[in-house]
Amino acid sequence: MKIAKVINNNVISVVNEQGKELVVMGRGLAFQKKSGDDVDEARIEKVFTLDNKDVSEKFKTLLYDIPIECMEVSEEIISYAKLQLGKKLNDSIYVSLTDHINFAIQRNQKGLDIKNALLWETKRLYKDEFAIGKEALVMVKNKTGVSLPEDEAGFIALHIVNAELNEEMPNIINITKVMQEILSIVKYHFKIEFNEESLHYYRFVTHLKFFAQRLFNGTHMESQDDFLLDTVKEKYHRAYECTKKIQTYIEREYEHKLTSDELLYLTIHIERVVKQA
Protein backbone atom coordinates (compact mmCIF):
# COMPACT_ATOMS: atom_id res chain seq x y z
CA MET A 1 0.00 0.00 0.00
CA LYS A 2 1.40 3.39 -1.08
CA ILE A 3 1.06 6.80 0.56
CA ALA A 4 -1.10 9.12 -1.55
CA LYS A 5 -0.64 12.18 0.66
CA VAL A 6 1.09 12.99 3.94
CA ILE A 7 -1.26 15.00 6.19
CA ASN A 8 0.99 15.15 9.26
CA ASN A 9 3.45 12.86 11.05
CA ASN A 10 0.60 10.67 12.26
CA VAL A 11 -1.92 10.78 9.41
CA ILE A 12 -1.77 9.88 5.71
CA SER A 13 -4.22 9.24 2.91
CA VAL A 14 -3.99 6.14 0.73
CA VAL A 15 -5.96 4.72 -2.19
CA ASN A 16 -7.12 1.13 -1.81
CA GLU A 17 -7.47 -1.51 -4.54
CA GLN A 18 -11.04 -0.35 -5.25
CA GLY A 19 -9.78 3.17 -5.94
CA LYS A 20 -11.33 4.59 -2.75
CA GLU A 21 -9.33 7.10 -0.72
CA LEU A 22 -8.81 6.18 2.94
CA VAL A 23 -7.50 8.28 5.82
CA VAL A 24 -5.03 6.23 7.88
CA MET A 25 -3.80 7.15 11.37
CA GLY A 26 -0.95 5.87 13.53
CA ARG A 27 1.77 7.39 15.72
CA GLY A 28 4.79 8.26 13.59
CA LEU A 29 3.16 6.66 10.55
CA ALA A 30 4.31 9.42 8.19
CA PHE A 31 7.53 10.48 9.92
CA GLN A 32 10.11 11.25 7.19
CA LYS A 33 7.72 9.83 4.58
CA LYS A 34 6.45 11.28 1.31
CA SER A 35 3.85 10.53 -1.35
CA GLY A 36 4.60 7.27 -3.15
CA ASP A 37 6.43 5.66 -0.21
CA ASP A 38 5.28 2.33 1.15
CA VAL A 39 2.99 2.45 4.19
CA ASP A 40 4.47 0.97 7.38
CA GLU A 41 1.40 -1.17 8.05
CA ALA A 42 2.68 -2.20 11.49
CA ARG A 43 2.13 1.41 12.64
CA ILE A 44 -1.49 1.64 11.46
CA GLU A 45 -3.87 2.21 14.38
CA LYS A 46 -7.05 3.35 12.64
CA VAL A 47 -8.42 3.51 9.10
CA PHE A 48 -11.20 5.98 8.27
CA THR A 49 -13.43 5.23 5.30
CA LEU A 50 -15.50 8.34 4.64
CA ASP A 51 -17.96 7.89 1.78
CA ASN A 52 -18.77 11.58 1.41
CA LYS A 53 -15.94 13.26 -0.56
CA ASP A 54 -16.69 16.72 0.84
CA VAL A 55 -16.60 15.40 4.42
CA SER A 56 -13.39 13.50 3.64
CA GLU A 57 -11.68 16.67 2.37
CA LYS A 58 -12.80 18.67 5.42
CA PHE A 59 -11.59 15.88 7.71
CA LYS A 60 -8.14 15.82 6.09
CA THR A 61 -7.86 19.61 6.32
CA LEU A 62 -8.83 19.48 9.99
CA LEU A 63 -6.24 16.82 10.79
CA TYR A 64 -3.28 18.96 9.70
CA ASP A 65 -3.16 20.75 13.06
CA ILE A 66 -5.06 18.46 15.45
CA PRO A 67 -3.05 16.58 18.13
CA ILE A 68 -3.20 12.81 17.69
CA GLU A 69 -4.69 12.41 21.19
CA CYS A 70 -7.66 14.51 20.11
CA MET A 71 -8.14 12.45 16.96
CA GLU A 72 -7.92 9.21 18.93
CA VAL A 73 -10.39 10.21 21.62
CA SER A 74 -12.88 11.55 19.07
CA GLU A 75 -12.79 8.27 17.16
CA GLU A 76 -13.15 6.38 20.45
CA ILE A 77 -16.24 8.43 21.36
CA ILE A 78 -17.82 7.95 17.93
CA SER A 79 -17.23 4.18 18.01
CA TYR A 80 -18.70 4.03 21.52
CA ALA A 81 -21.75 6.06 20.42
CA LYS A 82 -22.40 3.75 17.47
CA LEU A 83 -22.16 0.71 19.74
CA GLN A 84 -24.43 2.14 22.45
CA LEU A 85 -27.07 3.48 20.07
CA GLY A 86 -26.91 0.64 17.56
CA LYS A 87 -27.12 3.22 14.78
CA LYS A 88 -25.07 4.47 11.86
CA LEU A 89 -23.93 8.06 12.33
CA ASN A 90 -23.39 10.54 9.52
CA ASP A 91 -19.71 10.80 8.55
CA SER A 92 -19.84 14.54 9.26
CA ILE A 93 -19.44 13.77 12.97
CA TYR A 94 -15.78 12.92 12.38
CA VAL A 95 -15.26 16.56 11.41
CA SER A 96 -17.68 18.31 13.77
CA LEU A 97 -16.91 16.35 16.95
CA THR A 98 -13.13 16.25 16.44
CA ASP A 99 -13.09 20.00 15.83
CA HIS A 100 -15.34 20.66 18.83
CA ILE A 101 -13.31 18.55 21.25
CA ASN A 102 -10.05 20.11 20.08
CA PHE A 103 -11.34 23.63 20.76
CA ALA A 104 -13.06 22.56 24.01
CA ILE A 105 -9.71 21.31 25.32
CA GLN A 106 -7.95 24.50 24.21
CA ARG A 107 -10.62 26.70 25.85
CA ASN A 108 -10.48 24.68 29.07
CA GLN A 109 -6.72 25.06 29.29
CA LYS A 110 -7.17 28.83 29.00
CA GLY A 111 -9.97 28.89 31.60
CA LEU A 112 -12.56 29.81 28.96
CA ASP A 113 -15.18 27.06 29.33
CA ILE A 114 -18.52 27.84 27.65
CA LYS A 115 -21.88 27.46 29.41
CA ASN A 116 -24.38 25.25 27.60
CA ALA A 117 -27.75 27.03 27.43
CA LEU A 118 -29.47 23.78 26.38
CA LEU A 119 -27.92 21.53 29.04
CA TRP A 120 -31.18 21.06 30.97
CA GLU A 121 -33.13 20.19 27.82
CA THR A 122 -30.39 17.91 26.49
CA LYS A 123 -30.30 15.89 29.72
CA ARG A 124 -34.05 15.26 29.53
CA LEU A 125 -34.71 14.98 25.80
CA TYR A 126 -31.63 13.04 24.69
CA LYS A 127 -30.90 10.79 27.66
CA ASP A 128 -29.01 8.11 25.73
CA GLU A 129 -26.87 10.64 23.90
CA PHE A 130 -26.20 12.60 27.11
CA ALA A 131 -25.07 9.41 28.86
CA ILE A 132 -22.61 8.93 25.99
CA GLY A 133 -21.52 12.54 26.43
CA LYS A 134 -20.81 11.90 30.11
CA GLU A 135 -18.74 8.83 29.24
CA ALA A 136 -16.96 10.90 26.59
CA LEU A 137 -15.71 13.27 29.30
CA VAL A 138 -14.10 10.28 31.04
CA MET A 139 -12.47 9.25 27.75
CA VAL A 140 -11.12 12.79 27.22
CA LYS A 141 -9.75 12.85 30.77
CA ASN A 142 -8.06 9.47 30.34
CA LYS A 143 -6.57 10.35 26.95
CA THR A 144 -5.52 13.97 27.47
CA GLY A 145 -5.58 14.60 31.22
CA VAL A 146 -8.09 17.44 30.70
CA SER A 147 -11.28 17.50 32.81
CA LEU A 148 -14.04 19.10 30.74
CA PRO A 149 -17.21 20.39 32.51
CA GLU A 150 -20.64 18.76 32.29
CA ASP A 151 -21.70 21.43 29.79
CA GLU A 152 -19.42 19.69 27.27
CA ALA A 153 -21.27 16.39 27.75
CA GLY A 154 -24.34 18.26 26.53
CA PHE A 155 -22.51 19.68 23.50
CA ILE A 156 -21.15 16.23 22.61
CA ALA A 157 -24.66 14.78 22.94
CA LEU A 158 -26.01 17.35 20.46
CA HIS A 159 -23.25 16.50 17.98
CA ILE A 160 -24.35 12.86 18.22
CA VAL A 161 -28.03 13.77 17.73
CA ASN A 162 -26.95 15.88 14.76
CA ALA A 163 -25.21 12.84 13.21
CA GLU A 164 -28.24 10.62 13.94
CA LEU A 165 -30.68 12.95 12.20
CA ASN A 166 -28.31 14.13 9.44
CA GLU A 167 -29.04 17.73 10.40
CA GLU A 168 -26.95 20.87 10.81
CA MET A 169 -26.33 22.04 14.39
CA PRO A 170 -28.61 25.15 14.16
CA ASN A 171 -31.49 22.84 13.19
CA ILE A 172 -30.74 20.53 16.13
CA ILE A 173 -30.98 23.50 18.49
CA ASN A 174 -34.33 24.51 16.96
CA ILE A 175 -35.60 20.92 17.10
CA THR A 176 -34.67 20.74 20.78
CA LYS A 177 -36.51 23.99 21.53
CA VAL A 178 -39.69 22.80 19.79
CA MET A 179 -39.59 19.52 21.70
CA GLN A 180 -39.29 21.40 24.99
CA GLU A 181 -42.09 23.80 24.02
CA ILE A 182 -44.50 20.94 23.26
CA LEU A 183 -43.60 19.14 26.48
CA SER A 184 -44.31 22.36 28.39
CA ILE A 185 -47.74 22.71 26.74
CA VAL A 186 -48.62 19.15 27.80
CA LYS A 187 -47.20 19.60 31.29
CA TYR A 188 -49.16 22.79 32.02
CA HIS A 189 -52.34 21.65 30.27
CA PHE A 190 -52.61 18.63 32.57
CA LYS A 191 -50.74 20.19 35.54
CA ILE A 192 -48.46 17.16 35.83
CA GLU A 193 -44.81 16.21 36.18
CA PHE A 194 -43.63 13.64 33.65
CA ASN A 195 -42.30 10.26 34.68
CA GLU A 196 -39.11 10.66 32.68
CA GLU A 197 -38.09 7.05 33.32
CA SER A 198 -41.22 5.60 31.72
CA LEU A 199 -41.24 3.89 28.33
CA HIS A 200 -44.14 6.05 27.13
CA TYR A 201 -42.20 9.25 27.93
CA TYR A 202 -39.21 7.90 25.97
CA ARG A 203 -41.46 7.09 23.01
CA PHE A 204 -43.17 10.49 23.17
CA VAL A 205 -39.84 12.32 23.17
CA THR A 206 -38.64 10.20 20.24
CA HIS A 207 -41.84 11.03 18.34
CA LEU A 208 -41.39 14.75 19.07
CA LYS A 209 -37.81 14.63 17.80
CA PHE A 210 -38.91 13.40 14.37
CA PHE A 211 -42.00 15.64 14.41
CA ALA A 212 -39.79 18.70 14.97
CA GLN A 213 -37.38 17.53 12.27
CA ARG A 214 -40.24 17.36 9.76
CA LEU A 215 -41.35 20.81 10.88
CA PHE A 216 -38.01 22.41 10.01
CA ASN A 217 -37.55 20.37 6.85
CA GLY A 218 -40.98 21.41 5.59
CA THR A 219 -42.24 17.83 5.28
CA HIS A 220 -45.40 16.20 6.65
CA MET A 221 -46.55 12.84 7.90
CA GLU A 222 -48.91 11.62 5.19
CA SER A 223 -52.60 11.52 6.13
CA GLN A 224 -54.51 8.34 5.44
CA ASP A 225 -58.08 8.29 6.74
CA ASP A 226 -59.77 10.67 9.19
CA PHE A 227 -61.78 7.78 10.65
CA LEU A 228 -59.04 6.86 13.15
CA LEU A 229 -58.61 10.47 14.22
CA ASP A 230 -62.37 10.82 14.79
CA THR A 231 -62.30 7.68 16.94
CA VAL A 232 -59.31 8.89 18.99
CA LYS A 233 -60.83 12.37 19.42
CA GLU A 234 -63.88 10.80 21.02
CA LYS A 235 -61.99 8.27 23.13
CA TYR A 236 -59.19 10.58 24.32
CA HIS A 237 -60.95 13.94 24.25
CA ARG A 238 -58.77 15.54 26.97
CA ALA A 239 -55.58 14.52 25.20
CA TYR A 240 -57.02 15.83 21.93
CA GLU A 241 -57.78 19.21 23.54
CA CYS A 242 -54.08 19.41 24.41
CA THR A 243 -53.13 18.41 20.86
CA LYS A 244 -55.27 21.28 19.53
CA LYS A 245 -53.29 23.68 21.73
CA ILE A 246 -50.08 22.32 20.22
CA GLN A 247 -51.57 22.65 16.74
CA THR A 248 -52.48 26.30 17.36
CA TYR A 249 -49.02 27.03 18.73
CA ILE A 250 -47.16 25.35 15.84
CA GLU A 251 -49.30 27.02 13.18
CA ARG A 252 -48.92 30.44 14.81
CA GLU A 253 -45.18 30.27 15.52
CA TYR A 254 -43.93 28.18 12.59
CA GLU A 255 -46.69 28.44 9.94
CA HIS A 256 -46.78 24.65 9.70
CA LYS A 257 -50.15 22.92 9.33
CA LEU A 258 -50.49 19.56 11.08
CA THR A 259 -51.97 16.68 9.11
CA SER A 260 -54.63 14.34 10.48
CA ASP A 261 -52.01 11.67 11.12
CA GLU A 262 -49.81 14.10 13.04
CA LEU A 263 -52.79 15.07 15.20
CA LEU A 264 -53.63 11.39 15.66
CA TYR A 265 -50.18 10.29 16.83
CA LEU A 266 -49.66 13.32 19.06
CA THR A 267 -52.98 12.58 20.78
CA ILE A 268 -52.16 8.90 21.32
CA HIS A 269 -48.69 9.68 22.71
CA ILE A 270 -50.09 12.39 25.00
CA GLU A 271 -52.77 10.05 26.34
CA ARG A 272 -50.18 7.40 27.15
CA VAL A 273 -47.58 9.67 28.68
CA VAL A 274 -50.15 11.45 30.88
CA LYS A 275 -51.40 8.12 32.25
CA GLN A 276 -47.87 7.29 33.44
CA ALA A 277 -47.20 10.73 34.94
From Swiss-Prot:
Task performed by this protein: Mediates positive regulation of the glucanase operon (licST) by functioning as an antiterminator factor of transcription. Prevents termination at terminator lic-t.
Family of the protein in this entry: Belongs to the transcriptional antiterminator BglG family.
Repeat recorded as keyword: yes
PRD domain ranges (all copies): 65-170, 171-277
Gene Ontology MF terms in the entry: RNA binding
NCBIfam families: LicT
Post-translational modification: Phosphorylated.
UniProt organism field: Bacillus subtilis (strain 168)
Protein name per its UniProtKB record: Transcription antiterminator LicT
